[in-house]
Amino acid sequence: MKTLYSLRRFYPVETLFNGTLALAGRDQETTGFAWWAGNARLINLSGKLLGAHVAHAGLIVFWAGGMNLFEVAHFVPEKPMYEQGLILLPHLATLGWGVGPGGEVIDTFPYFVSGVLHLISSAVLGFGGIYHALLGPETLEESFPFFGYVWKDRNKMTTILGIHLILLGIGAFLLVFKALYFGGVYDTWAPGGGDVRKITNLTLSPSIIFGYLLKSPFGGEGWIVSVDDLEDIIGGHVWLGSICILGGIWHILTKPFAWARRALVWSGEAYLSYSLGALSVFGFIACCFVWFNNTAYPSEFYGPTGPEASQAQAFTFLVRDQRLGANVGSAQGPTGLGKYLMRSPTGEVIFGGETMRFWDLRAPWLEPLRGPNGLDLSRLKKDIQPWQERRSAEYMTHAPLGSLNSVGGVATEINAVNYVSPRSWLATSHFVLGFFLFVGHLWHAGRARAAAAGFEKGIDRDFEPVLSMTPLN
């Protein structure tokens, strides 16, 4: 099977004490990789590599199920999810399971079911992983040619790509079906403070859906992260699912064009680098989404966004001082600008003070108070509802600014509580993991290109001093 590279060039690493851990066909002598290089030993053993991937999927699903049940066991219905350090239950609640008006949890049984289903699935995957790693055929090409492959077989690789794209498309449509037919999803914009509803009037207009991609990523534009209604989100999944499925069929039925055969590197390590690059992009986009977007990630479950907590503070003190007799329309702040209200660069009436930088914020508790020219003074004087006051006071004291030792909230906010927002956790983890994946992409892309060009950078291993020394064992 070693048809692509000379072992000496492609597997330059020599390590000691390898003999004791040798497995037939998976030791350093036969693969060029030591035990610690993990799946690199299985580059040409498709059956064993299948086992490694299935077992890895089992570990992922086991974590999901176990963590899900852990969160259910610790969940206190009287407290908001974001005060309890939960990262999985908010996702289930966003999908409309177990919640009612205002995001209140009315039934935790669906969460329990989700955890148990994932645990059962992980057992099946774990068994399959162990079977293929230890008992199944080492290579699939002979017994199961459909599942076999050679890394440089361009046609087979694009067929595998097509199958993956179809699976991703089906995944996108699962969300669409949940929103349309299976109980709906949670809409933070539903009147009166959010509720679960079926999405009936999908946005399928390509100018709207693809218009998001053409927006600037900065300021009030916010690229795709600026999406703020569920019709657009679910409609976008219809488009995405359709494109993935059609693209998958295309890649299964066609062979790569000549320009693609020339431009791309066709090796296992190259495919690894492409995948890491794609995952890195996903990580960075997810980071921005969970940090800024309060429609796909409702604040009832994930806590307020940073801009939302800041605007909530301005709103809370406007309400308080207005009750104490302040004229919020004309009061002047220490800088000579409006203390409570001022104008944005484009003329809208916005909150004054430090929160002016977040004037683009849109949030369901605030939008009813806006008119055609920004915040409406008469509505601020007459129309503020108790639920809006309660929600903004809650969000003011739960800003997503927290350190790892759980001293959460704004440093100067005397009413803040000790907590770290799930938005902080999810945004930080996805940024850091996205960055690591990007470094891995650069590393493996460089190695794959070097191998394809016929050279490897590094020490000349043929004359390394350590080779003449006594083995450690």
From Swiss-Prot:
One of its GO terms (biological process) is photosynthetic electron transport in photosystem II. Keywords: Acetylation, Chlorophyll, Chloroplast, Chromophore, Manganese, Membrane, Metal-binding, Phosphoprotein, Photosynthesis, Photosystem II, Plastid, Thylakoid, Transmembrane, Transmembrane helix. It is found in: Plastid, Chloroplast thylakoid membrane. Residues 1-14 form a propeptide. InterPro entries: PS_antenna-like, PS_II_antenna-like_sf, PSII_PsbC, PSII_PsbC_sf. [CaMn4O5] cluster binds at E367. GO terms for cellular component: chloroplast thylakoid membrane; photosystem II. The modification Phosphothreonine is found at T15. The chain crosses the membrane at residues 69-93, 134-155, 178-200, 255-275, 291-312, 447-471. The keyword Electron transport does not apply. GO terms for molecular function: chlorophyll binding; electron transporter, transferring electrons within the cyclic electron transport pathway of photosynthesis activity; metal ion binding. It is a multi-pass membrane protein. Binds multiple chlorophylls and provides some of the ligands for the Ca-4Mn-5O cluster of the oxygen-evolving complex. It may also provide a ligand for a Cl- that is required for oxygen evolution. PSII binds additional chlorophylls, carotenoids and specific lipids. The modification N-acetylthreonine is found at T15. The keyword Ribosomal protein does not apply. Gene3D superfamilies: photosystem ii from thermosynechococcus elongatus. Belongs to the PsbB/PsbC family. PsbC subfamily. HAMAP family: PSII_PsbC_CP43. PSII is composed of 1 copy each of membrane proteins PsbA, PsbB, PsbC, PsbD, PsbE, PsbF, PsbH, PsbI, PsbJ, PsbK, PsbL, PsbM, PsbT, PsbX, PsbY, PsbZ, Psb30/Ycf12, at least 3 peripheral proteins of the oxygen-evolving complex and a large number of cofactors. It forms dimeric complexes. One of the components of the core complex of photosystem II (PSII). It binds chlorophyll and helps catalyze the primary light-induced photochemical processes of PSII. PSII is a light-driven water:plastoquinone oxidoreductase, using light energy to abstract electrons from H(2)O, generating O(2) and a proton gradient subsequently used for ATP formation. This is Photosystem II CP43 reaction center protein. It comes from Panax ginseng. The lineage of its organism: Eukaryota, Viridiplantae, Streptophyta, Embryophyta, Tracheophyta. The gene is psbC.
